[in-house]
């Protein structure tokens, strides 16, 4: 699945908004996701090697927000269960790691 320029812009804004709402640092997210802070920042900017990475970050942020009793801000493209998208590796997403 490829995103249009507008969809990419919106998705980056949505990830950033939920990242800020979760109140985590790049360092904390990187540690939790078994990667480096620079990699988390790259995923926030949709500069990814694997198309599953934004889904992994989305799931992580949603869990962080749920643990705080907060509701994630809506996503326009990263919606629902990634398993419905045949092109995504759901096993990779389920691992919850960005390494």
Describe each region flagged by the PLM.
Residues 70, 74-99:
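Helix-turn-helix/homeodomain-like alpha-helical modules used for DNA recognition
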Residues 47-59:
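Short, basic-rich loop-to-helix N-cap that marks the start of a DNA-contacting helix
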Residues 35-50:
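Recognition helix of helix-turn-helix/homeodomain-like DNA-binding domains
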Residues 18, 32, 43:
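Residues in the recognition helix of alpha-helical DNA-binding motifs
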Residues 25-31:
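Short alpha-helical "recognition helix" segments of helix-turn-helix
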Residues 1-21, 59, 63-71:
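A short, Lys/Arg-rich alpha-helix, primarily the initiator
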Residues 27, 38, 59:
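Residues within the helices of the helix-turn-helix
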């Amino acid at each position: 699945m490829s995103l249009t320029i507008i969809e990419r812009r919106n998705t980056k804004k949505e990830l950033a908004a939920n990242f800020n709402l979760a109140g985590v640092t790049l360092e904390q997210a990187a540690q939790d996701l078994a990667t480096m802070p620079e990699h988390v920042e790259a995923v926030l900017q949709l500069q990814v090697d694997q198309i599953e990475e934004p889904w992994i970050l989305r799931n992580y942020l949603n869990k962080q927000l749920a643990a705080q009793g907060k509701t994630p801000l809506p996503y326009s493209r990263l919606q629902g269960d990634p398993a419905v998208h045949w092109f995504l590796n759901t096993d990779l997403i389920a691992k919850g790691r960005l390494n």
